[in-house]
């Protein structure tokens, strides 16, 4: 579980134990810490390219600033430090292997004061790192025992909500950056040793009628009933609101982000397909069935997605035209570091505009965030 750095904090793969490092150690790319665009991390793109997406890029940038502020105020209910926030972000960035993110979060982590070298602090950081890595790389394995481990090392409900939002956000950020890099024709730069995410086991999806319920977190913040009922939260967030309200600013920005991405010319059917594929890969049965119950026009595809991955591969071989969208969503979900220009070109060849393609694939990245929130913060029966 523990990954050790060769040169202090200067290497992406930070260790989970505190140590004393030389004061002159620098990150691999120190300038990567300083960016004007807190979400796309100064990826060079013409303004006219980004213009159609500013409605959701703006809340995404505000989320980056909110999740990683210059100063973090801690108290009894909010103990997740600036170091733990940035360490979690770097762990997730490492999982997805998008170099721009790894450089940025490594550079920002370097100057932060780490926890003390006590066994308790080391154990807490190790648990946080392991949890972040697992939820990012294989969300289906997360369950009640993992939540208990986090509680045992002192994470409060607010801490837990915040950490899961950070993990979801950085995953969305990694996929969006990979998407725009592919649009720009950047070559794929793979980091050796990173595995592609596997499909969750098909047996989980045998149950077509399921109920998601929130895990029994101690509730530290109760939303006013009138305010809660009046707020127009998206359907995808309704069940999560009693927990996500612990970070109300983040919840409101996530709501704005979801609504903005959905306000595009992409068809409802395409959005549903992307949501189904991501939830099938990530193992979120609750998200999958919620989509399945409303996507009546996708009955055949839904039945196919409930089967083993090999059945889907056979279907794709027989339907090369129809599988183009599936392939793009799959690669962005399973291996954003390998998402290439060729996958976007295949969508364009089917008559999908660049604006539609980017909105659709950004939505699939958001779905991955929502899948992880549902898995991390509750259980499905």
Language-model segments: which ranges?
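Hydrophobic alpha-helical segments
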Residues: 1-381
């Amino acid at each position: 579980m523990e990954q050790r750095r060769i040169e202090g904090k200067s290497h992406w793969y930070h260790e989970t134990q505190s140590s004393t490092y030389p004061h002159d150690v620098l990150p691999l790319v120190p300038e990567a810490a300083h960016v004007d665009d807190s979400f796309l991390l100064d990826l060079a793109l013409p303004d006219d390219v980004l213009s159609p997406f500013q409605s959701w890029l703006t809340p995404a940038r505000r989320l980056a600033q909110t999740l990683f502020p210059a100063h973090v105020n801690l108290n009894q209910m909010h103990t997740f430090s600036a170091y733990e926030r940035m360490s979690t972000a770097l762990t997730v960035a490492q999982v997805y292997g998008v170099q721009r993110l790894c450089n940025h979060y490594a550079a920002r982590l370097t100057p932060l004061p780490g926890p003390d070298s006590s066994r308790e602090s080391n154990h807490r950081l190790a648990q946080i790192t392991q949890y972040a890595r697992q939820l990012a790389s294989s969300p289906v394995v997360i369950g009640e025992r993992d939540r208990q481990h986090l509680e045992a090392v002192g994470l409060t409900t607010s801490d837990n909500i915040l950490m899961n939002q950070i993990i979801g956000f950085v995953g969305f950020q990694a996929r969006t950056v990979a998407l725009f890099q592919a649009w720009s024709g950047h070559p794929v730069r793979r980091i050796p040793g990173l595995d592609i995410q596997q499909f969750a086991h098909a047996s989980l999806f045998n149950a077509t009628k399921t109920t998601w319920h929130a895990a029994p977190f101690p509730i530290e913040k109760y939303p006013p009933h009138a305010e809660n009922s009046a707020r127009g939260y998206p359907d995808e967030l309704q069940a999560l609101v009693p927990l996500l309200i612990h970070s109300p600013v983040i919840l409101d920005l996530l709501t704005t982000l979801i609504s903005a991405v959905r306000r595009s010319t992409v068809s409802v059917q395409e959005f549903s397909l992307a949501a189904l594929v991501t939830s099938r890969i990530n193992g979120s049965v609750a998200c999958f069935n919620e989509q399945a119950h409303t996507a009546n026009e996708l009955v055949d595809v839904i039945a196919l997605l409930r089967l083993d991955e090999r059945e889907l591969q056979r279907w794709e071989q027989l339907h090369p035209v129809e599988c183009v969208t599936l392939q793009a969503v799959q690669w962005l979900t399973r291996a954003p570091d390998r998402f290439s220009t060729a996958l976007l070109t295949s969508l364009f060849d089917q008559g999908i505009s660049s604006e539609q393609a980017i909105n659709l694939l950004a939505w699939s990245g958001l779905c991955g965030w929502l899948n992880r929130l549902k898995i991390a913060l509750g259980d499905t029966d």
